[in-house]
Amino acid sequence: AGYGAGSILAYYTSASDKNGQIQCLAYSKDNGRTFTKYEKNPVLRPSDGLKDFRDPKVFWYAPESKWVMIVSADKEMRFYDSHNLKDWNYLSSFGEGYGVQPCQFECPDMVELPVDGDINHKKWALIVNVNPGCYFGGSATQYFSGYFDGTKFICDNMPNVTKWLDWGKDHYATVCFSNTGDRVVAVPWMSNWQYCNIVPTRQFRSANALPRELGLYTQDNDIYLSAAPVAETKNLRKESKDVPSFTVDKDYHIESLLTDNEGAYELSLNIEAG
């Protein structure tokens, strides 16, 4: 982009009544301490004047030595590319009619991962955060596995197939780090648009969930995205308790699970269907 080695570029959505939602650039030459807005902002506008056009995610596409940007555009994702990080060209779109519908697409991300740990067999996972109307209420994170050829994303599944990254109520705005070596590590926002505006707050709303390492695996001739807490979270463990095997009929109570713990618990369960 011409700002020198070690510079940091930040892409963000600027929103106003006059200009709508547009994508802008800011750069830092002091290791992120301060940022300067690019004098020729915006770097990207919706060609059709779309109102909901936000959440840019930029990644390096090595096979063509170029940068790719994904932007959420109402009920689809739009792909753009650039060789100088300033001038962006439209490539394609994906998502209309796919997955849970009709939902607002937001906060995209896309990563390439080995399937079942095989580095010679890789697939792309397109992460799409959607709101509202999800299966368990409000907002959630779905994903699509498939192929990306540098121009368009081709989904493995039929449009009516929906895959959820997490089945909890508080999992949204999932984004991946780009400096975690061989691992792909993601962090979601631990909240839901059903009630996030009434959560007590000062400088922020809710919190982030635990970081998790992503992976692709096969099951029943299909490909799914796994999300396991990163290994570093084991350092948070303190007191532990083993519970012997038991059969669950209706209710089963375990008294005083951890005597010195008044906060969160981690449960590791092996469940066998009766």
Go through the PLM ranges and name each one.
Residues 1-18, 22-26, 39-48, 52-80, ...:
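Hydrophobic core segments of beta-strands in well-ordered, beta-rich domains
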Residues 1-3, 32-60, 71, 89-112, ...:
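Surface loop/turn signatures of beta-propeller and other carbohydrate-active proteins
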Residues 4, 19-20, 52, 104, ...:
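A short, structural micro-pattern
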Residues 16, 27-35, 77, 86, ...:
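A generic secondary-structure signal for well-formed alpha-helical elements
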Residues 22-31, 80-84, 138-151, 201-216:
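Beta-propeller blade signature
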Residues 32, 65, 221-222:
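Detector for glycine-centered tight turns/loop "hinges" at secondary-structure junctions
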Residues 113-117, 124-125, 131-132, 136-152:
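Acidic, glycine-rich loop-and-beta core segments that form the ion-binding/anion-interacting portion
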Residues 119, 147-169, 173-274:
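Beta-rich accessory regions
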